[in-house]
C-alpha cells in the first residue's frame, strides 16, 4: 500500500483529525522482539477514524504499511551519547526512513548539540538536497526552535518535545501557548505531547493547529491503566 503524498495532499488528509502514534520500545509490554505488534494498534486506529499514524523504526513502519493505507509520520529513535537528540538524529536514520517510503520524516529540531556536529538548518539543507520531495516535520520544544526550523525549510512543526528540554516549559499539560504562537505565524502546526483527554484535543484545534498527534492516551495500555489506578491510590 503506497501513494504519493504532496504537502497539500497530506494537509488535506490530516487537517482536523487525529493522528495516532503507535509505538512500543524495548522493555515495554507491547514490544515483541520477534515481530511488531504495532500493525494491530494502527488497524484499530484506522477503524476508529484516525487520519494518520506516527511510528518509530523501519520494522514497525513496514509492518504498519501492510495493513493500513494511511500517511505515516516516521521516526527512528536511536541514542547517540553523550548528545541528547535521539529522534532521527542523523542522515543515517533519514536514509532508512526514505528507503521504506515514510510519508513525513520527523526529527529532533531542538537547538541542542547534535551527534553529527551540524546545526539544524544545515541538517535540513542536506536532507532537502538529497531528497528534495521528502516531507519533513520538525519536533521542537519552544517557539524559537519552531520558527528557526520552519524558516530553514521544514514543512510542518510539531510541539513534540516541549517539556523534554531545559529550554522549554516544564508541565504535565500540553503546551497550548506554544501551539498558538506557532500557529499565529501561519506555520502548519502538528500538536503533539501530553494530550490525554478529548477536551485537550478540542482546545488544541481552537488555537489554529493543522493536526494533532495522540499517542500514550490511546496506544500505551500501561499509561492508560496508571491514569485510572493513580486516582484511587
Swiss-Prot record:
Pathway involvement of the protein, from the record: Amino-sugar metabolism; N-acetylneuraminate degradation; D-fructose 6-phosphate from N-acetylneuraminate: step 3/5
Keywords (A to Z) from UniProt: Carbohydrate metabolism, Isomerase
Reaction it catalyzes: an N-acyl-D-glucosamine 6-phosphate = an N-acyl-D-mannosamine 6-phosphate
Top-tier EC class: isomerase
EC number: 5.1.3.9
Any one Gene Ontology BP term: N-acetylneuraminate catabolic process
Listed GO MF terms: N-acylglucosamine-6-phosphate 2-epimerase activity
CDD domains linked: NanE
Superkingdom of this protein's organism: Bacteria
CC terms in the record's Gene Ontology section: cytosol
Family designation: Belongs to the NanE family.
NCBIfam families recorded: PRK01130.1
HAMAP family in alphabetical order: ManNAc6P_epimer
Role, per record: Converts N-acetylmannosamine-6-phosphate (ManNAc-6-P) to N-acetylglucosamine-6-phosphate (GlcNAc-6-P).
PANTHER family assigned to the protein according to its UniProt record, in alphabetical order: N-ACETYLMANNOSAMINE-6-PHOSPHATE 2-EPIMERASE-RELATED
Name of the molecule in the record: Putative N-acetylmannosamine-6-phosphate 2-epimerase 1
Amino acid at each position: 500500500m503506497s501513494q504519493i503524498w504532496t504537502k497539500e495532499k497530506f494537509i488535506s488528509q490530516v487537517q482536523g483529525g487525529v493522528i495516532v502514534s503507535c509505538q512500543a520500545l524495548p522493555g515495554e509490554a507491547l514490544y515483541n522482539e520477534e515481530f511488531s505488534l504495532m500493525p494491530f494498534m494502527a488497524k484499530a486506529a484506522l477503524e476508529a477514524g484516525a487520519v494518520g499514524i506516527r511510528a518509530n523504526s523501519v520494522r514497525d513502519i513496514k509492518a504498519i504499511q501492510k495493513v493500513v493505507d494511511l500517511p505515516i509520520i516516521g521516526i527512528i529513535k536511536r541514542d547517540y551519547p553523550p548528545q541528547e537528540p535521539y529522534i532521527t538524529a542523523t542522515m543515517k536514520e533519514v536514509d532508512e526512513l526514505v528507503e521504506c517510503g515514510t510519508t513525513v520524516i520527523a526529527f529532533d529540531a531542538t537547538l541542542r548539540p547534535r551527534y553529527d556536529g551540524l546545526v539544524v538548518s544545515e541538517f535540513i539543507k542536506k536532507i532537502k538536497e538529497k531528497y528534495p520531495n521528502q516531507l519533513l516535520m520538525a519536533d521542537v520544544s519552544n517557539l524559537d526552535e519552531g520558527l528557526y526550523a520552519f524558516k530553514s525549510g521544514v514543512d510542518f512543526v510539531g510541539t513534540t518535545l516541549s517539556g523534554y528540554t531545559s529550554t522549554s516549559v516544564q508541565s504535565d499539560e500540553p503546551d497550548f501557548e506554544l501551539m498558538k504562537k506557532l500557529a499565529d505565524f501561519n506555520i502548519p502546526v502538528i500538536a503533539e505531547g501530553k494530550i490525554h483527554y478529548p477536551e485537550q484535543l478540542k482546545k488544541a484545534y481552537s488555537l489554529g493547529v493543522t493536526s494533532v498527534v495522540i499517542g500514550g492516551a490511546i496506544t500505551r495500555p500501561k499509561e492508560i491503566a496508571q491514569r485510572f489506578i493513580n486516582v484511587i491510590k
